[in-house]
Amino acid sequence: MSETLNLLKQLIERPSITPNDAGCQTILIDRLKSVGFQCEHLPFGEVHNFWAWHGHQSPFIIFAGHTDVVPPGDETQWHSPPFTPTEKNGYIYGRGAADMKSGLAAMVVAAENFVKQNPDHNGTIGFIVTSDEEGPAENGTQKVVDYLQQKNIKLDYCIVGEASSNEKLGDAIKIGRRGSMHGELTIIGKQGHIAYPHLADNPIHRSFQAFEALAKTKWDEGNEHFTPTSFQFYNVEAGAGAANVIPATLKAKFNFRFAPIHTTQQLQQKVERILNYYQLNYDIQWNVSSQPFFSGNGRLATFVRQAIQEICHLNTEPNTYGGTSDGRFIATTGCEVIELGPVNKTAHHVNENICIADLEKLTDIYFRTLQLLI
């Protein structure tokens, strides 16, 4: 059994449902320490984090990832227990197999092998690992990055081991991510009897035109690196608990996924202009869960693409598709950030799995990238 597969199995066996680490980080730390890495536990609240490094020079390349996973859902729908790593037809099944325990296993084994072969290597290799990526992401990577900045540690390059590939390992890498902003909107009307609408002010009726305008607004055209900004309602609630009452309020929640084309303030102002145009009485609360980032095709991305070409014989597609990742926190330091990991088709799904043959290739890509960088 390969070292990467063996480590992945050990990690899948730990039911590390966010924010519980379930002992995964102890396994990783013990392995890294055995080849000379220095490691620091950095717990914040109930979240487990660690920071590890080997070397004392620049450039500083970081591997980043998370040990937490989403809940397995209805376990009767799995063909094998979600926390029992199961090999079948060339694949290994288990919660976290794709997102992202395979990435973690491959990164750690690649770093081990590199340090064993190059004990006095140039540069510094580091790890940022958290158990708070699938949850609120408040006490995880963000706090570790703050800690490193307080210590004046300058990061140069970062590979996040998220499942970035689409159909084949290495066919895509992320060189940026859109931002995410939520709005909680309350439309204020006047409660009344449904038989006497002239004595009430129905917030549901009042909202229709404004909501249609928001849904149909073209916020931007996107650009060569980012798709157009997306606006989606995801929850609308109204009602007074009785069929003969016009409610006093309507509550709606919506989300923006946006490129660096806009600031959050610009989007907020545009929403409020639309609401004001339709003369709505409203209250709105905003929550910016992540800012967009774009690292572009820098030195790290160039070497990653070379490594993928050499090992997988693919011309990878750099893109910014998908949701958010912890790369957004690391990018705030000015570090070049890319995401490179396994195929993402089964992430968060029942019967999550990863191709076993891809594990060795992914390990080799990480190893080759280290060779090219330092």
Curated annotation (Swiss-Prot):
- Please state the pathway this protein functions in, per its UniProt record: Amino-acid biosynthesis; L-lysine biosynthesis via DAP pathway; LL-2,6-diaminopimelate from (S)-tetrahydrodipicolinate (succinylase route): step 3/3
Keywords in alphabetical order: Amino-acid biosynthesis, Cobalt, Diaminopimelate biosynthesis, Hydrolase, Lysine biosynthesis, Metal-binding, Zinc
State how the cofactor is bound.
Binds 2 Zn(2+) or Co(2+) ions per subunit.
What residues bind Zn(2+) 1, as annotated? H66, D99, E162
Q: Where does Zn(2+) 2 bind?
A: D99, E134, H348
Entry annotated with the keyword GTP-binding: no
Its GO biological process annotations read: diaminopimelate biosynthetic process; L-arginine biosynthetic process; lysine biosynthetic process via diaminopimelate
Cofactor(s) essential for the protein: Zn(2+); Co(2+)
Query: Recorded E.C. number(s)?
Result: 3.5.1.18
Q: Which catalysed reactions does the entry list for this protein?
A: N-succinyl-(2S,6S)-2,6-diaminopimelate + H2O = (2S,6S)-2,6-diaminopimelate + succinate
Q: Which residues form the active site?
A: D68, E133
A Pfam family it matches: Peptidase_M20
Top enzyme category: hydrolase
- Note the Gene3D superfamilies from the entry: 3.30.70.360, Zn peptidases
Recorded GO molecular functions are: acetylornithine deacetylase activity; cobalt ion binding; succinyl-diaminopimelate desuccinylase activity; zinc ion binding
Function according to Swiss-Prot or TrEMBL: Catalyzes the hydrolysis of N-succinyl-L,L-diaminopimelic acid (SDAP), forming succinate and LL-2,6-diaminopimelate (DAP), an intermediate involved in the bacterial biosynthesis of lysine and meso-diaminopimelic acid, an essential component of bacterial cell walls.
Q: Which family does it belong to?
A: Belongs to the peptidase M20A family. DapE subfamily.
Q: How does it assemble?
A: Homodimer.
Identify this protein by name.
Succinyl-diaminopimelate desuccinylase
By which gene is this protein encoded? dapE
